[in-house]
Structures are given as structure tokens and as C-alpha cells.
């Protein structure tokens, strides 16, 4: 979900790495999370396997009570059109080196033990506090939120995935807030 719809500078992580998946799930980015919608994409071979089987076996379910809601479909089509019109996937790709440089600028901070990134995503891993794993991450989350930045944490790792429309000045602002949060927790 996080690596789809341009986040890595390509339509999906599979495209960036030259992989052709047999099955792929997608959701939030399909409608920019404005309206709930999800999808399952399958290759022709997988689809045919389900559809060409005996009549008494499980089919590839593709319609439920809430399927094909017109509002969600319209939101999905509009979102896909905007991705293309605004060249957002290409924009993300063009920001990647700036993003990486800015994120790796946090490397020398106390308690930062690893930084991982690709595209417009990053994970800043902090050393766990003795006897309280996850507390540094939680405290960083709270400090960032109080300073106006919404981040996600997993244990003691701050996970960042900014919007595709982020500007370089906003990247600087975000990482200044994250750096301050990390510096102000023990």
C-alpha cells in the first residue's frame, strides 16, 4: 500500500524493480484515500485458472454488496487522471535524491542506529530504550505531532511517507521537526 501509486517514483514497487506480479492488492492510493476503495489485480493466467475450472469449485469473487460503488469508482478515475495530469510519479522520482540526502542528514543523531529509504519513504530506526522497547518511537511520534508533523512509528522506527506533492522546503521542515523530536528524547 505504501509503495504504490508513485511513492517510489514508479506506478508500483513491482514496476520499479521490473517484477510482473501474478496478484496485486491496492487500496488507499487508488482514490487518494478520499473514498474507501480497494482492488485486487490478477494476471490473465491466474484469472483463467479460476474461470476455466470445474463448475463446482470456488470462483474468483469479484462482486460483493459494496462492490463497484459509483462514488468510489468516480473518485478512483479522477485520482488516476490527476496522477497522470500532474506527473506525480515523475515528481516523486525527481525528489528522491533530495529526500534521501535530507533523511540521511539525521544519521549522526544520538540513538539513531539505522536509516533505510527508497523513493519517498524512509525508516529512521532508533536504539530501543533498555526495558522499554518502543517508547522512543512513541515519544518521537508525540513530539512530531505536537510540532505539526504527522509521522508513523513501528516500535522504535519512525516511518515517513510524505505526500507526492511535498516541496523541498516542506521536506526540510518535516526533517527539522523529526530531528528535534529525536534530539529531545533520551
Locate predicted features.
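Conserved N-terminal phosphate-binding loop of PLP-dependent enzymes in the Aspartate aminotransferase
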Residues: 1-186
Amino acid at each position: 500500500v505504501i509503495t504504490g501509486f508513485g511513492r517510489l517514483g514508479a506506478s508500483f514497487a513491482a514496476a520499479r524493480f521490473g517484477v510482473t506480479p501474478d496478484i496485486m492488492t491496492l487500496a488507499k492510493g487508488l482514490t487518494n484515500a478520499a473514498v474507501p476503495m480497494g482492488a485486487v489485480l490478477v494476471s490473465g493466467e491466474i484469472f483463467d485458472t479460476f474461470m476455466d475450472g470445474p463448475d463446482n469449485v470456488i470462483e474468483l469473487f469479484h462482486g460483493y454488496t459494496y462492490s463497484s460503488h459509483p462514488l468510489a469508482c468516480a473518485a478512483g478515475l479522477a485520482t488516476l487522471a490527476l496522477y497522470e495530469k500532474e506527473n506525480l510519479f515523475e515528481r516523486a522520482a525527481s525528489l528522491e535524491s533530495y529526500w534521501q540526502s535530507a533523511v540521511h542528514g539525521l544519521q549522526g543523531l544520538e540513538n539513531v542506529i539505522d536509516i533505510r529509504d527508497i523513493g519517498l519513504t524512509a525508516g529512521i530506526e532508533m536504539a530501543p530504550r533498555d526495558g522499554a522497547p518502543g517508547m522512543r518511537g512513541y515519544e518521537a511520534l508525540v513530539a512530531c505531532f505536537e510540532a505539526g508533523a504527522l509521522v508513523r512509528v513501528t516500535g522504535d522506527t519512525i516511518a515517513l511517507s510524505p505526500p507526492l506533492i511535498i516541496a523541498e522546503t516542506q521536506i526540510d521542515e518535516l526533517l527539522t521537526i523529526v530531528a528535534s523530536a529525536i534530539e529531545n528524547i533520551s
